[in-house]
C-alpha cells in the first residue's frame, strides 16, 4: 500500500459507485443488438498476456475471397455503461487510468465492469466499438467501417500461444506455452486466420519501414 499512499492513488471505490456499477443487466437486450452490427458468427479471439484479467480488445477474421479478407478490431464499448456525468463517469475522470503495480491493479472502473461486463471473455456476447477493414494480404485497404457492434469471442489466446503456432507453422500449442499447461491443437480455420493476420501484419510493417 505504500506506493498507493505515496502517490495518493485510490484503491477502493465509494459504495455508491459500486452500487451503480452493480445495477447493470448482464444479458444484452435484443433491442440493443438490433442497433448494432452483429459479428457474433464471425471468428473472433483475444490475444493478451497470460496473466491478463481484463480483455479489452479482440480481433475478428473472415476470408472473403482468395486474396481478400475482412479484419475487425473490436474494443469494449465502455460508453454503453459509463454515461456522461454519472457517478461512474466522475470516478473514472478522477482516476484517469488503471494503474498496474507488481502485485495488483488499481482499476479505473469497478471490477464488475473492467473484469466482467466490459471484458471480452471467451464464449460470451459483448458490446464493442469496432474498426472493420476489407484488406488484401499486402495490406491494401479496400473498404473501412467504424461503429458499434456486438461480438462473441470464440477463443482466448496468450501471446506465447500464438507465437508458438507462428514459429512452428503448425496448429499446435506446446505445453510450455499453453495457458492450461497441456499441449493442444487449434482448429485449422483458426490457425489459418492467425497465419493470414501475421502475414498481413508483416507486409504492413515492411511497407512502413520503407517509408
Please annotate each region the language model reported.
Residues 1-211:
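Electropositive polyanion-binding surfaces
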